[in-house]
Amino acid sequence: MTLDPTKHPDWKIALDAESRMKTVETLAAELGLEKAELLPYGHYMGKVEQQAVMQRLKDRPNGKYIDVTAITPTPLGEGKSTTTIGLVQGLARRGRRSSAAIRQPSGGPTMGMKGSAAGGGLSQCIPLTPYSLNFTGDLHAVGAAHNLGMTALTSRMQHERNYDDATLEKLSGMARLNIDPTRINTGWVMDFCVQALRNIIIGIEGDGRRNDGFMMRSHFDITVASEVMCILSIARDLRDLRERMGRMVLAHDRNGKPVTTSDLGVAGAMTAWLVEAAKPNLIQTIEGQPVFVHTGPFANIALGQSSVIADRVALKLSDYHVTESGFAAEMGYEKFWNLKCHYSGLVPDAAVVVATVRALKNHGGAPQPKPGQALPEPYTREDVGLVEAGCANLLHHLGIVRRSGVPAVVCINKFHTDTKAEVDAIRRICEQAGARVALSEHWEKGGEGALELADAVTDACNEKNEFRPLYNWNSPLTERITTIAQEVYGADGVEFEPLAAQRLKDLQERPDADELGVCMVKTQYSLSDKPALKGVPKGWRLHVRDVLFFGGAGLVAPVSGDISLMPGTGSKPAFRNIDVDVETGKVTGLF
């Protein structure tokens, strides 16, 4: 008997569903994989040999490609993963061969503010605990590859300090790279949110010995912000992955020349850590539909997409494939539209914009809800006025999708506490704007509650598609950044601080400047670069304070506002609720 999500936490619902789930071999056979194309990880998870699948099905047409995005979220999240899974379950109930692609959750948010990213209620993916903790080891492999690169860099700096040119050549055949310790492009990574590691000193020599490393300032980023994760997300195949790994710029020499992983002789070994991680993972929804889980970059500080490889494989195996972009349309969908689709060559058939009464109330003027705390009073009573005022944010995000030329569906992700009047107000405003809108109760009712959404998406996929990029990649980097700020965020313009302006000037002078993508780094809690500005801010300019460069990924990342690549852990973290039943070995408290 299915548990009631209004009475039971997600982890209990998942445990109940896991007692009836298919083996991964059964799941793969239903998906159309041959036996040799599946690498089982236990009974219920597996990896897919993507190169074998793509070769076998190279002449098969792709299925319909749908992206799920959202309005500007609250810190509680508005249910994009839940909607992605619910939509796939709804499509399956309509007899359509469907699959989902979601990102692998990071340990930091899982143990911090968010808990698992497996969906929720009756629209989850399972098995929940392995998916949320460790999974098939991909995040560990990404971290190991990244930190191996840093090991090669810092050890090389130590040896060049300790030995003259002749000795370096004699000992290892190394030529001096003359690395500038003040121009190290990256730090180390780990998969937790540790604010204490944002700024550190490494290589402290203690008693003066010269074998304890090169003393310098350094830092840790969260693993999902690593360039290695981004490369894994956009690589089309293993060859593309290897080539990109060799172009990563870890530092500069004293003459300003980039020092790459190839210069350090470590690119091949870094790629070796990723051979298995490059294969998409396969699990299932609680109703038995296939879910591809592959890569996990955040959308505010990185690409925010599951992998190109997973989507390409799934589109050969499914009639409808639903992928998810991180955070809201101005962040995740913009990067899906102008970066992921550029790298993959794929064209979406439809996009879903998820909206909740809760987030609309926030944009209408209600105070920001906080994880782990009771909802403020405006969220616990009916307030149609707040919902109507907040719909300006929804219409802005709908406009972003329309600008891409892709047919859009607004999904009202209904919570069981929402009132009919509040839901009717959203529907009325969307319909007045000419939008296709669907109410979905997938959290509470699973696929049965997503039938209206499934039908709306099916209809949208049959509409005329005029997909087009936002900008020309041949245009200058500053022009592309300004286009994103004005056309997507709604800014009046862009202010480049001197450091950012100089770095953009240097990057624009590269011969491959028109091959570099623009991957914005900005808060996810506002259309602007100030998280407190809700709704649709007016009369503001985007301030770009720095520009990061990722040579392997081929991305330029303008940084706006006060945002860190290493998030912090708050005062009421999720890990306090997580434990293990020592009699059964089952993990409890994941949500």
From Swiss-Prot:
It holds the Pfam family FTHFS. Pathway: One-carbon metabolism; tetrahydrofolate interconversion. Transmembrane segments: none annotated. PROSITE patterns: FTHFS_1, FTHFS_2. It comes from the Bacteria. GO terms for molecular function: ATP binding; formate-tetrahydrofolate ligase activity. Keywords: ATP-binding, Ligase, Nucleotide-binding, One-carbon metabolism. ATP binds at T74, P75, L76, G77, E78, G79, K80, S81. It catalyses: (6S)-5,6,7,8-tetrahydrofolate + formate + ATP = (6R)-10-formyltetrahydrofolate + ADP + phosphate. It is an enzyme of class 6 (ligase). Its EC number is 6.3.4.3. InterPro entries: Formate_THF_ligase (IPR000559), Formate_THF_ligase_CS (IPR020628), P-loop_NTPase (IPR027417). GO terms for biological process: tetrahydrofolate interconversion. Belongs to the formate--tetrahydrofolate ligase family. This is Formate--tetrahydrofolate ligase. It comes from Desulfovibrio desulfuricans (strain ATCC 27774 / DSM 6949 / MB). The gene is fhs.
